[in-house]
Amino acid sequence: MENMFRLMGSEDSSDRRRCIWVNGPVIVGAGPSGLATAACLREEGVPFVVLERADCIASLWQKRTYDRIKLHLPKKVCQLPKMPFPEDYPEYPTKRQFIEYLESYANKFEITPQFNECVQSARYDETSGLWRIKTTSSSSSGSEMEYICRWLVVATGENAEKVVPEIDGLTTEFEGEVIHSCEYKSGEKYRGKSVLVVGCGNSGMEVSLDLANHNANASMVVRSSVHVLPREILGKSSFEISMMLMKWFPLWLVDKILLILAWLILGNLTKYGLKRPTMGPMELKIVSGKTPVLDIGAMEKIKSGEVEIVPGIKRFSRSHVELVDGQRLDLDAVVLATGYRSNVPSWLQENDLFSKNGFPKSPFPNAWKGKSGLYAAGFTRKGLAGASADAVNIAQDIGNVWREETKRQKMRTRVGHRRCISVA
């Protein structure tokens, strides 16, 4: 690539370390956040390199999502900068459609990531004023690289690593199948089987719905309170309605209106084992980042008894689970819909922008920029819209510096050229 230059290394096969200077920022992660940042940098005329540990873009969507998943929000709030979704796409694009959109996006902006490059560490070198990013190849070569650059964009996202809870007996005694929701594809293989879904977020609800649709005997563990909202209210998405209301009313009133509308549409959910938090859905989202569940059909299955809500787990044994209320359920499989976490602390050697939980210390919209050329894209807890906002800000910030320095370089070149002519 024209913006990468090999600095040192050996042709000897015993020396697998290569050092590469990147003339522009390095973006870690080729998901939607990384692609959006790359596209905006391309528009700014700034060269870049994208490092991706998988062998494809958007690996979370391509390899770690179930077949039936769709975008939970309308496409117009999920599109990336500079390129809308195709007009013939539905309001809530499918998994396949979203992947095709991202592939078209990468092609349009000529984004060609360095695949199978797993970042082991990234640190800022105070002496040189540059970032040093060490990677290993996940391919058979096992080669090692060190990328050196002035700017580093962390775009590995909020969902880089799965969260697997420690539950008594789950891995030591239970003999049935145990998978994380990132490994779940379809309920077809569980037809007629008893499956426990651990977790009641959007993934847990959707997996439970899919299991019920495939005639599995589905139970879902709900340990804590949860906000469930209809995905649409009077033909408009709950998200759009909440954003509109927040322009005119205080947050507490917006939450009150949303909860009244949810009660009118979904009814009283407490009798089904779903208690609401004391804090309203939008306030809770802003304060903690916890997203309300948008119902796409799971509540109907819960009300009909096709999906059973159960309390917390006490322990697992060979073929069943004992719950905290004394119930015992015979099980064939367990799906852990227990979410994901950021993996930034495992490789980024920095403590200014990011906190120990792998998220920026500052809240949105001020979480995209750190010191020494460090940036964060897609850690806003605001979904794709937040990632797009980060991408635009990052590209403009780097672009301003890039253009100014390019202008100065041209001026120095002109001055030097004139001196040469006068001497001649």
Swiss-Prot record:
The prosthetic group or cofactor this protein requires is: FAD
> Where would one find the signal peptide in this protein?
none
Pathway entry: Plant hormone metabolism; auxin biosynthesis
Q: Which SUPFAM superfamilies match?
A: FAD/NAD(P)-binding domain
Kind of enzyme, top EC level? Answer: oxidoreductase
Annotated positions binding FAD = 29-34
Catalytic activity, reaction form: indole-3-pyruvate + NADPH + O2 + H(+) = (indol-3-yl)acetate + CO2 + NADP(+) + H2O
One Gene Ontology term from the biological process aspect of the record: auxin biosynthetic process
* Annotated TM spans: none
Tissues showing expression: Predominantly expressed in roots and young vegetative tissues, while it was under detectable levels in reproductive tissues, such as inflorescence stems, pedicels, and floral buds.
At which positions is NADP(+) bound?
199-204
List keywords of the entry alphabetically.
Answer: Auxin biosynthesis, FAD, Flavoprotein, Monooxygenase, NADP, Oxidoreductase
EC?
A: 1.14.13.168
Under Gene Ontology molecular function, one entry of this record is: flavin adenine dinucleotide binding
According to the lineage, what is the superkingdom? Eukaryota
Which InterPro entries does this one have?
Auxin_biosynth/cation_transpt (IPR050982), FAD/NAD-bd_sf (IPR036188), Flavin_mOase-like (IPR020946)
Function of the protein: Involved in auxin biosynthesis. Belongs to the set of redundant YUCCA genes probably responsible for auxin biosynthesis in roots.
The UniProt family comment states: Belongs to the FMO family.
Name of the protein: Probable indole-3-pyruvate monooxygenase YUCCA5
What is the organism of origin for this protein?
Arabidopsis thaliana
Q: Which gene encodes it?
A: YUC5
